[in-house]
């Protein structure tokens, strides 16, 4: 059996993406707390004979001073590690140091245009990652034998953009497109099913698409306070520090059909 736990251990981020679901309270689990979390995940995997992966996310995980220690600790348990990052702080030094510990690096690429990235909020002050910089990052990841994944959050701000040249150039092992879903003032930028269908019809590379509906209740997420939830709304108050992970997961209303489709059938 295969499973993936998404550990959104920090809220801190250098970008201000309008579609982001992360709390803006800027919490981050301490390293001692992270070790407790990893130990509970290890026990859950071991007790259930699961070949598991911990996916490190945020916020921006590479902003954490504990990221290296966290990767080392997870690896010491023989648990697979993956990271989702915006790429801004992804250095060659970091990649070289952890190339044998990280199986997958997912880069969030929502636009290749400077102005569009500014409108989305994918910027550090007024600085964005250029296509040239993204290409360099992607090539380095693949050269070190790490699987490259590209994520694109589809919104009205990028629905008319063509990513084909970029995707066919970097050739990720997985290209994932997610329909923007949020419940704040930025929901005006959510695309309709028809708009998404038109966008997808133009892609000439194998991709996986997840609608907002498919994402609901189909993840296992541990957030920056240690709360466990099944989607990106962080509505759960079930704390991993109060329960064994197996018991906590059983309390959640997980859509196992979509969970299995994402993590088992697509692995």
Describe the role of every protein-language-model region.
Residues 6-8, 55-57, 82-86, 106-110, ...:
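A cross-family glycoside hydrolase active-site/sugar-binding cleft signature
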Residues 1-6, 43-49, 217-219, 254-257, ...:
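N-terminal [4Fe-4S]-dependent radical SAM core
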Residues 69-72, 96-99, 120-122, 163-166:
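Short, glycine/charged-enriched secondary-structure capping and boundary segments
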Residues 42-46, 97-101, 167-171:
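Acidic (Asp/Glu)-rich catalytic clusters
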Residues 50-52, 77-79, 101-103, 144-146, ...:
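Short, well-ordered coil/turn segments that N-cap beta-strands
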Residues 1-82, 90-96:
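Conserved alpha-helical substructure of the radical SAM core
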Residues 29, 114-229, 233-251, 259-266:
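Radical SAM enzyme [4Fe-4S]-AdoMet core and its adjacent flexible, acidic
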